[in-house]
Amino acid sequence: IDLVGKPQCFNCMYGFDFENNYLLFKSSNDSYHSKNITPNSLIAGTILPNKLMPFQNIGIQFNGITLSTDQNLKERINTNYYIKNPLSIAIPGKIWLIQLNKIKMTGKLKGFGQKITWERSTN
């Protein structure tokens, strides 16, 4: 949601922190969407495979909140992100964390498949 209450979509490369189950993405500090993202912002998105094939509906939908990184976490997060996206080291920007709260995975091949959902425990 931007500063005037309108939805804002953007494409990005991502990584994952398996230890904490955080989704990671990097964005330039002066991009429109970075200016609208603050810690504890609600966020939603989709992740699709690199190759889209006709008659296949495969991917995930997620929602969560953005988190700030403390210095101890920052080094590990940067390492995880740059292992998956090594060329992005040369691009200035900030790596953001998303605490995933809900995921729905769709795996349909030629019309047949399943949907799997996961939701963070509220305890």
Language-model segments: which ranges?
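Short acidic (Asp/Glu) patches
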Residues: 27-31, 41-49, 75-85
